[in-house]
């Protein structure tokens, strides 16, 4: 029974129920438009109005994102009391849909045909019936119907077919709006439903997406309750057994080296042996900036800085650690790391070498939900869920690869066991202890059956030619059976059972062997990865190739590995220990070269680091107060092609959501100019556009190009432009003294107040114009750039599509239109000051 809502409109009291929405699957298109009476919906939920831009994510029993049937259907039902009169109803739908009023069909939309061409004409621009009404977006059908309704209660039913063969399974801008003749249309719903205008539609879409984000979190966590309880029981058993064994002995220090926790005691013991001293402690604000970047991927906001400084000095660092560990940014920042390590490589164009599905969304939800890391590995290796909507099944893909599971075996061994097997792909590895058979036997376990060695994965043998310098033991076409190749780490017989069983039993075996409590290597590798991420260098280097390195602090590695396991494989627990240590809180070591080699890694302080590409881009947006403006990561906006051809990765809100733009052929119509300006910066700072292979470390050494692109590039220029969509424009217009405004700007960008000399320089630069900085009568204008969604792969060969994209790029190069609300000379000087702050080494370096 739905709760009744009361609304007052035109002096009359009207009753309205919420919109009930049902999702149906495994029916044909005809049945989906008129579901049989015995059809049972797989999902029932509510929406605030008749605009359906997003469908709830479908989750499996262990909370993996799943695909819905092809096609699936939506039915929305609503009742409302209306006054008598003539009404205009408008149905907008990309595909087949039907609107009924009181049991009578009044409007029907036709099915959307799939598209296979690339030389369609560009459709005409949307037509506005008047200056306010939002036009229908291509390829939506816009169907109008006039009807005279008597006063009283009326029932509205919308049914729609979503997706289908060759189509993308999203609803587009499916909506119903209405109004009495002569009035502006609102979305069908309560009297307070949004008007069908651009501004109100945009606000509605943002609100609905937030609502679905929150609902998806609740639903997937509820779906995961039973499985989570089984994992908890497993962890309690492992913990009880491990606590029966002696813990590593924590050394006692002879000197007065600073100590916050046991990490400092282990580190200090070696420092005493080598007679070296630690670096000094960071200031409170240096620590907060480093902590925020390392834990959440962005610099702290002024509000966070003030909350931090409001805490008592003795407890503020500990409280800050707990705040960042509880932040939503924790999940965002880990995604980018595992995208590299697991070679997540989705493409928004047609498949290229080693493209995967976008399992980034599952990585994010795993860290957001705080699932234990051993469960993370098990779910990854199950390779189940949706391949194109964000599930681990996307990891199984390696397009255009002759042996996809061999590629995945390389990644898994390297990521979780520190075993680099890449050289064993085509022959026995000459410098690693692996044979080609080892790699393919692990691949066969992940495949769930024997694998035949592809001819293209062998070294060609030319009759009478020179004998290869490598050993080629396998022949093309030879079958290799499933077999565990790492008996030196753990015997196959020790695999055990896991709470959630994969559909392919041998994949379950691989996961069980990797995360077994008897496999000491797994927790050591993960702890080493976490340590390297926060301190700049690992106990073992390279972190992904343990056959080449020895641990610099084996006892501390064992100690942290034990902590990791007894905590229930909780990454946050290890992070908390590291963040709380005096070592992490020290000033960085100036010269990384002094810390190379196991003997030289004394950890007198963290290694000096620059921001990662993702940290830089996200912090630039946050620090300069700009929204993440970018096109959708989608070259199929009309939705008339299937996900296995063209992915829709949505509109990015963080840098990890970017992807390769796949326009190597330099077709201007396929360009996404704003996204390209962001990708250009990220690439120069070490981000990999194409992750065809796994990587733990990036090629991100400082270079002149980094300085040049930040100082002169499109994105850097756009960030410092004071336009009407910049928060810093509002700051400059606020009623406050100049020194307070500059303090706020320094806090935003550099996470500290300005020094006295900096304030003097800023006062000399801006002081004479500051009192007259506001322009009377100037109005705020919409400065956001918008992409023309008429351009897609389907028409990218047309000259008009090229002209549209080239004009968008030209506009982008000109930059956002400066605000007219600030006096031009003052605005330009303030932009110069902001440019200097953003381009200072202090901004890019992690304290």
Per-range role (PLM):
Residues 195-258:
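N-terminal pre-domain segments of enzymes
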Residues 503:
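Glycine- and hydrophobic-rich flexible loops that cap the catalytic core of alpha/beta enzyme folds
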């Amino acid at each position: 029974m739905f709760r009744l809502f009361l609304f007052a409109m035109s002096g009359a009291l009207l009753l309205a129920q919420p919109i009930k929405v049902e999702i149906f699957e495994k029916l044909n298109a005809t049945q989906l438009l008129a579901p049989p009476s015995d059809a049972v919906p797989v999902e029932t939920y509510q929406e605030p109005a008749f605009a359906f831009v997003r469908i709830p994510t479908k989750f499996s029993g262990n909370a993996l994102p799943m695909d819905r049937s092809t096609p699936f259907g939506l039915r929305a039902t609503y009742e409302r009391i209306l006054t008598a009169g003539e009404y205009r109803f408008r149905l907008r739908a990309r595909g087949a849909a039907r609107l009924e009023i009181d049991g009578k069909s009044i409007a029907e939309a036709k099915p959307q045909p799939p598209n296979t061409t690339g030389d369609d004409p560009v459709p005409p621009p949307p037509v506005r019936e008047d200056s306010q009404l939002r036009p229908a977006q291509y390829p939506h059908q816009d169907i109008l119907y006039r009807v005279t309704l008597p006063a009283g209660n009326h029932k509205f039913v919308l049914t729609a077919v979503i997706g289908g063969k060759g189509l993308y399974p999203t609803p587009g801008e499916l909506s119903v709006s209405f109004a009495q003749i002569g009035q502006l249309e609102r979305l069908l719903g309560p009297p307070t439903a949004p008007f069908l205008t651009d501004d109100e539609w945009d606000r509605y879409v943002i609100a609905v997406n937030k609502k679905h984000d929150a609902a998806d979190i609740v639903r997937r966590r509820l779906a995961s309750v039973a499985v989570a309880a089984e994992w908890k029981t497993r962890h309690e058993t492992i913990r009880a057994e491990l606590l029966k064994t002696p813990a590593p002995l924590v050394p006692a220090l002879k000197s007065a080296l600073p100590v916050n926790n046991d990490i400092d005691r282990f580190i200090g013991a070696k420092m005493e042996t080598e007679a070296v001293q630690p670096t000094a402690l960071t200031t409170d604000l240096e620590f907060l900036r480093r902590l925020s970047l390392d834990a959440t991927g962005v610099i702290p906001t002024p509000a966070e800085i003030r909350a931090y400084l409001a805490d008592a000095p003795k407890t503020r660092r500990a409280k800050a650690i707990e705040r960042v560990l509880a932040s939503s940014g924790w999940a965002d920042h880990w995604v980018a790391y595992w995208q590299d390590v697991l070679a997540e490589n989705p493409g928004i164009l047609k498949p290229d070498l080693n493209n995967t599905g976008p399992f980034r969304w599952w990585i994010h939800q795993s860290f957001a939900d705080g699932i234990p890391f051993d469960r993370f590995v098990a779910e990854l290796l199950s390779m189940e869920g949706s391949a194109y909507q964000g599930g681990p099944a996307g990891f199984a893909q390696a397009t255009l690869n002759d042996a996809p599971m061999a590629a995945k075996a390389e990644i898994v061994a390297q990521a979780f066991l520190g075993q680099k097997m890449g050289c064993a792909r085509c022959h026995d590895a000459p410098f690693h202890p692996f044979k080609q058979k080892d790699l393919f036997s692990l691949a066969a376990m992940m495949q769930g059956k024997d694998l035949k060695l592809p001819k293209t994965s062998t070294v060609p043998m030319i009759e009478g030619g020179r004998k290869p310098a490598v050993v080629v033991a396998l022949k093309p076409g030879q079958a290799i059976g499933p077999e565990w190749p790492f008996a030196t780490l753990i015997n196959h017989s020790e695999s055990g059972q896991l709470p959630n069983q994969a559909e392919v039993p041998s994949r379950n075996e691989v996961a069980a062997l990797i995360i077994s409590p008897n496999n000491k290597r797994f927790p050591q590798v993960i702890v080493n990865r976490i340590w390297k991420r926060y301190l700049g260098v690992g106990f073992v280097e390279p972190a992904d190739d343990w056959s080449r390195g020895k641990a610099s602090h084996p006892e501390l590695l064992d100690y942290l590995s034990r902590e990791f396991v007894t905590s229930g494989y909780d990454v946050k627990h290890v992070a908390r220990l590291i963040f709380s240590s005096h070592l992490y809180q020290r000033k960085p070591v100036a010269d990384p070269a002094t810390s190379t080699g196991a003997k030289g890694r004394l950890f007198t302080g963290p290694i000096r680091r620059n921001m990662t590409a993702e940290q830089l881009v996200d912090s630039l947006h946050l620090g300069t107060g700009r929204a993440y403006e970018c096109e959708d990561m989608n070259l199929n906006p009309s939705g008339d092609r299937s996900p296995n051809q063209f992915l829709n990765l949505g509109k990015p809100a963080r840098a990890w959501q970017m992807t390769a733009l796949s326009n190597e052929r330099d077709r201007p119509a396929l360009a996404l100019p704003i996204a390209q300006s962001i990708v250009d910066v990220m690439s120069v700072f070490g981000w990999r556009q194409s992750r065809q292979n796994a990587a733990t470390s990036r090629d991100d050494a400082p270079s002149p190009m980094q300085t040049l692109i930040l100082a002169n590039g499109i994105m850097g220029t756009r960030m410092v432009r004071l336009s009407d969509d910049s928060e810093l424009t509002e700051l400059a217009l606020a009623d406050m003294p100049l020194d307070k405004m500059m303090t706020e700007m320094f806090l935003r960008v550099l996470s500290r107040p300005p020094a006295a000399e900096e304030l003097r320089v800023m006062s000399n630069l801006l002081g004479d114009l500051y009192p007259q900085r506001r322009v009377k009568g100037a109005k705020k204008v919409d400065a956001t750039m918008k992409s023309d969604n008429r351009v897609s792969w389907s028409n990218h060969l047309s000259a008009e599509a090229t002209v549209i994209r080239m004009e968008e790029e030209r506009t982008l190069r000109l930059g956002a239109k400066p605000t007219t609300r600030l006096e031009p000379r003052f605005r330009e000087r303030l932009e110069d000051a902001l440019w200097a702050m953003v381009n200072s080494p202090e901004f890019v370096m992690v304290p």
